[in-house]
Regions:
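Conserved small-residue
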Residues: 1-321
Length: 323
C-alpha cells in the first residue's frame, strides 16, 4: 500500500498502482489513502501499528508491504529475528544515505480501444467460454458493423489508423517508410477534402486496412467491452492487518462470496473474469460487481484495477494460480 501523496508528487496521481523495484525488492504498490485510514480509526502513534517501522510519526508512514516483497530476506538465516532482518535490509537499501530511489517498472493503463472502454479478446478466451454458433454471430456483430463503417465512412478509417499505429512527422534526414507515408497521407488528405476518398490511393489503402482487420478477427482479436485489469486481493483486510496485530483473516469485511469491485463497470453488473493466460472453462469466474464504500473510500481505484476476495475462496485456483 503506497500513500496517495507519493503518487501525486511523482507524476502518477492518475494511476491506481505502480510496479516498484529496488535492491532485492519488488512490489505492486496501490494508490492508498493511508492517512485517512489512520485518522478515521484514531491512530496517532506508530506504536499502534502491527509490523516493523523506523518511522517516529504516523504521518511518516508512506509505504506498507508484506515480507514477500523483500527478496533480501531469502539470503538471511531463518532463525534471525524479524526486526534484525529489516534493519539489515534497510542498511543495504539506503547505503548510509537519507533516501533510496525506487524504479517504476510500469503502472496501470487504459484499454487500447474507445478511450479505455474496450479491449481485444484472444483465442484462449474464445475457446473456453463455450460459444454457440449463434453466440459467435452475436459476438462478431459489432465488429462487422464497424468493418462496414470503415468501408463507407472515412472518420472510422482514420480512427482505425490512429488506433493501430503510432505515426509522427518525418524528419528531414529520415528515410520515409512507405507504409507510414501512406498512413500519414490518408490521414491528412481525407481531412482536407472528401474528394480524396474517390482516389485509387485511398481505396487501395482502405482495402489493405480492412484486410488487416479481418485477419485480426480470424486470430480471435475481437473488440469487446472490458479491460485487462490488475488484481488487488483483500485490500481492506490489509488495512485492518496494519493496525491490528491480532487480526486473523477468517472472512472478508468488504466483499461477499462471488463479488468483485471495479470502477470499470456499473454497480451490480455481472462480469466475466479470466486470467490471461488460462487453460480451461474451469478458469472462468463469473462475479457481481459491487462498489464497496470502504474500498472506494481508502483506495484510489482506476477502471484498470479490480478488487477481489481470496479469504475462504478458491479464486486463486480458479483463475489458474493468479496472485
Amino acid at each position: 500500500l503506497l500513500d496517495s501523496e507519493i503518487f501525486n508528487t511523482n507524476g502518477y496521481g492518475t494511476h491506481g498502482m505502480m510496479l516498484l523495484r529496488n535492491r532485492f525488492f519488488k512490489t505492486c504498490a496501490f494508490n492508498t489513502n493511508l492517512q485517512d485510514w489512520f485518522f478515521d480509526n484514531d491512530i496517532t502513534q506508530v506504536s499502534r501499528l502491527a509490523g516493523y517501522t523506523t518511522a517516529r510519526d504516523i504521518k511518516d508512514i508512506k509505504l506498507v508491504i508484506t515480507e514477500s516483497s523483500v527478496k533480501y530476506f531469502k539470503f538471511m538465516p531463518k532463525d534471525m529475528p524479524f526486526e534484525q532482518k529489516c534493519k539489515r535490509f534497510l542498511d543495504a537499501l539506503y547505503e548510509g544515505k537519507n533516501s533510496s530511489v525506487f524504479g517504476v517498472v510500469k503502472a496501470d493503463h487504459d484499454a487500447p480501444l474507445m478511450d479505455g472502454m474496450m479491449a481485444y479478446t484472444n483465442y484462449q478466451l474464445l475457446n473456453t467460454i463455450g460459444l454457440t454458433r449463434e453466440g459467435v454471430g452475436k459476438l462478431l456483430e459489432p465488429s462487422f458493423e464497424y468493418l462496414q463503417d470503415m468501408l463507407n465512412r472515412s472518420p472510422f478509417l482514420r480512427y482505425q489508423i490512429n488506433m493501430t499505429t503510432d505515426h509522427a512527422t518525418i524528419a528531414e534526414n529520415e528515410v520515409p517508410d512507405l507504409a507510414k507515408y501512406r498512413r500519414d497521407t490518408v490521414l491528412d488528405m481525407s481531412c482536407r477534402t472528401p474528394l480524396f476518398e474517390q482516389t485509387e490511393f485511398y481505396k487501395s489503402f482502405r482495402s489493405d486496412t480492412v484486410r488487416y482487420f479481418k485477419e485480426r478477427l480470424r486470430k480471435g482479436r475481437i473488440a469487446v467491452s472490458g479491460n485487462y485489469q490488475v488484481l488487488f486481493g483483500n485490500a481492506y483486510e490489509f488495512l485492518w492487518a496494519l493496525t491490528d496485530e491480532s487480526y486473523e483473516p477468517t472472512f472478508s469485511f468488504s466483499l461477499d462470496d462471488g463479488q468483485v469491485c471495479t470502477t470499470g463497470f456499473a454497480h451490480g453488473e455481472m462480469v466475466l473474469c479470466a486470467r490471461s493466460p488460462h487453460i480451461t472453462m474451469g478458469n472462468l469466474y463469473l462475479a457481481q460487481n459491487a462498489h464497496c464504500y470502504d474500498l472506494l473510500r481508502y483506495f484510489n481505484l482506476t477502471p484498470n484495477i479490480i478488487c477481489v476476495n481470496a479469504i475462504e475462496s478458491n479464486i486463486q485456483q480458479r483463475l489458474n494460480g493468479c496472485d
